[in-house]
């Protein structure tokens, strides 16, 4: 079970976007995350009239490592760590500071 999943709200704790919050769009296999509006890079694209792609400079999200982000706890309004607990025979994710379920 992953500590950070798609659609979780996270806060960046290290790097050029430190302090920014965003929603996880994609979780990649090598402990990297794509987060909406964070770690934006510019890519130069060639126009392709066959597929209708207009050329130019495109800004898009680049993946960042999971160690540079923390899950955001809305109850405490701070970054938090994730732990696991077994409740009713199911393994659930909980915030370490409040012991409340992440998906609640």
From Swiss-Prot:
Family annotation (SUPFAM superfamilies): Translation proteins SH3-like domain
Short name of one Pfam family: ribosomal_L24
Annotated transmembrane regions: none
GO terms under cellular component: ribonucleoprotein complex; ribosome
Source taxon at top rank: Bacteria
Biological processes per GO annotation: translation
Keywords assigned: Ribonucleoprotein, Ribosomal protein, RNA-binding, rRNA-binding
Single GO term (MF): structural constituent of ribosome
Subunit structure: Part of the 50S ribosomal subunit.
Record function comment: One of two assembly initiator proteins, it binds directly to the 5'-end of the 23S rRNA, where it nucleates assembly of the 50S subunit. One of the proteins that surrounds the polypeptide exit tunnel on the outside of the subunit.
Family under the similarity heading: Belongs to the universal ribosomal protein uL24 family.
HAMAP family named among the record's database cross-references: Ribosomal_uL24_B
Protein name: Large ribosomal subunit protein uL24
Organism: Pseudomonas syringae pv. tomato (strain ATCC BAA-871 / DC3000)
Lineage of producing organism: Bacteria, Pseudomonadati, Pseudomonadota, Gammaproteobacteria, Pseudomonadales
